[in-house]
Amino acid sequence: MPRKVDHRARRELLADALLRLAATRGLEEVSLRHVAAEAGVSTGMVQHYFRTKDEMMTFALDMVMDRIRARSQAAMTSTVPRELVRSLLLQVLPLDETRRQENHVVLAYFAYAAVRPAIASGLREAAAQTRRFLADQLRAAGAFDLDPERAAAGLLALVDGLGLQLLSRQLAEEEAVAALDAQL
């Protein structure tokens, strides 16, 4: 009797191996062979689930974004717009090991996106969705004298910068959270 294989789980296993490589050694170290070694499987298995490196890279990025989205939605328990915005932005900052790894990976993907239009498109769409959500919450909060779209873009830029400061250990976590709170 043939074994039933969960193809999604196998693809996620391989994507997790890719993400570990990206977080520790950078995306330039990602290859089908390196991912296979990291996952403890054959290169043939990787090729079975992903035809190309770009297909694997896109899947892994989508998986990271889905995880960030799911964690952010779970953390947004308030109905107060300002608290919703704060909850979302705190989930993006590298304040624990999981988020540090995700930030390392997303940062590597930004560099990769400079030469890969498909990756750039995925990052652009994720940022646009986040900006729309933030702008909607700012509108709901009735923020005076603010253009919600510009304010949302500014908050995302702030969090990106704070993330870099945290990753490079130029700011302590408490300082980054205080800087974010000062802008809210």
Predicted regions and their residues:
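Amphipathic C-terminal alpha-helical segment
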Residues: 95, 108, 112-115, 155-174
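C-terminal peripheral helix-coil segments that are non-catalytic and often amphipathic
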Residues: 1, 131-139, 154, 158, ...
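N-terminal intrinsically disordered/low-complexity leader segments
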Residues: 1-9
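Hydrophobic alpha-helical connector segments
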Residues: 59, 73-102, 148-155
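Amphipathic alpha-helical packing segments from all-alpha helical-bundle domains
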Residues: 69, 98-107, 117-142, 153
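Short, basic, alpha-helical segments at the C-terminal edge of helix-turn-helix-like DNA-binding modules
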Residues: 62-68
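Helix-turn-helix
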Residues: 13, 17-55, 59
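Residues in soluble alpha-helical coiled-coils and helical-bundle/repeat scaffolds
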Residues: 51-55, 76, 80, 97-101, ...
